[in-house]
Amino acid sequence: MVTVEEVRKAQRAEGPATILAIGTATPANCILQSEYPDYYFRITNSEHKTELKEKFKRMCDKSMIRKRYMHLTEEILKENPNLCAYEAPSLDARQDMVVVEVPKLGKEAATKAIKEWGQPKSKITHVVFCTTSGVDMPGADYQLTKLLGLRPSVKRLMMYQQGCFAGGTVLRVAKDLAENNKGARVLVVCSEITAVTFRGPNDTHLDSLVGQALFGDGSAALIIGADPIPEIEKPIFELVSAAQTILPDSDGAIDGHLREVGLTFHLLKDVPGLISKNIEKSLVEAFKPLGISDWNSLFWIAHPGGPAILDQVESKLALKPEKLRATRHVLGEYGNMSSACVLFILDEMRRKCAEDGLKTTGEGLEWGVLFGFGPGLTVETVVLHSVGI
C-alpha cells in the first residue's frame, strides 16, 4: 500500500516551470497614432470639440506609441453608432463581438506557440485563458479548446476582468500547475480586444480619453511546463518565483466597471507615482533571497501601462535607459494591450537576443524581473531565469 506522501511526491515535477514556446497575434487593422486623433474625433462625431481634440492630440503625441492594432474598423463602428457615443447603451453589441473575437484571436497566438513547441496538441494538459474583454458562459477557455481541437479532458481555468496586471497572474498560476503536476504542459493565452472600452470623448472624463489614446488589441500564448524533454523541447525562460501584492493607499487608483455602456475605465492621476514609490519593496522581497540588489544587473519586462509609469520607474530605480528597451518597443509598436503586453515583451526580448547573438535569452544576463501593474493597484512580480542561446 502506498502512502499519501509517496503519491504526492510522484505527482510533482522536479525542475522549475519553464516557458517552452511563445506565440503572438493581432487583428489585421493597423492604426497609426499620428493619424488617430483626426480619425477618432471624426468617427465619434466629435469634431466640434476642438479644445478636447487638441488635448487628445497631445496625449497621443506624448504616448510614445507609433501604431496600434484594433478589431474595430470604421465599417464596424458605422454599423454600431452607440459604440461611438460617450454613454449610450451598447453592452450587447460589444459582447456579441468579443465573445467571438477574443477566442479567435487567442487561437491565432496559440497555434503559433504550439507550432514552435513542436509537440502534438494532445499533450496539452491545462489551459489558462485570460481576458478583460467581455464575459460569457461557457467561457473563452471552452471556445478556445473547441477551436484548437484540444482533448475534452483538458483542465481549464478562465480568468475574466483582471486587467493589466494579469500577464503576471497567468505566469504565477501556470507555474503552480506545471510544478505540481508531473508532465503537465500548460497552454496560457491572454487575448484582449478594445471593443469593450472604445467610446466617444467627454470633457469631464479625461481618464477615459487616456484609455482611448493608449489601448490596443493583441493576443499572446505560451506553453509552460517543468522538466523540458531534452532535444525535443527548447526552454526560453524559467519561472523562479511569483508574488502578488496590493499597494498601500491605492484604493480606486485604477478601476474598471462593466455597465450598459460597456467597460468604463477610471484612472487616478498619480498611478505612476504610486507604482514607482512602491516598486523597490517588491524587488527587495523577490531578489534579497537570491543575494541580488543591483537592479541594473537584471533584465526587465514591465507592463507598459503608459510612458509616465516607465519614466518614473526608470528614474526611481536609476535604471539605465536600455533596461526598458524591450518594454518601450512593445508599447511603441502595439500600445497597451492589457494582460498580453508582458508576454509580447518576453517574445521581443528572446527574439532580439538571438538576433544580436547574445549568450542568453535575457539580454545576455542571468536573472530578470517581470512586473504586471493593474486595478487595485495590484502588482505581480515574477522572477525569471534566462536560458543560454
Swiss-Prot record:
This is Chalcone synthase H3. One of its GO terms (cellular component) is cytoplasm. The keyword Cell membrane does not apply. PROSITE patterns: CHALCONE_SYNTH. The gene is chs_H1-211. It is found in: Cytoplasm. It comes from the Eukaryota. Belongs to the thiolase-like superfamily. Chalcone/stilbene synthases family. Keywords: Acyltransferase, Cytoplasm, Flavonoid biosynthesis, Transferase.
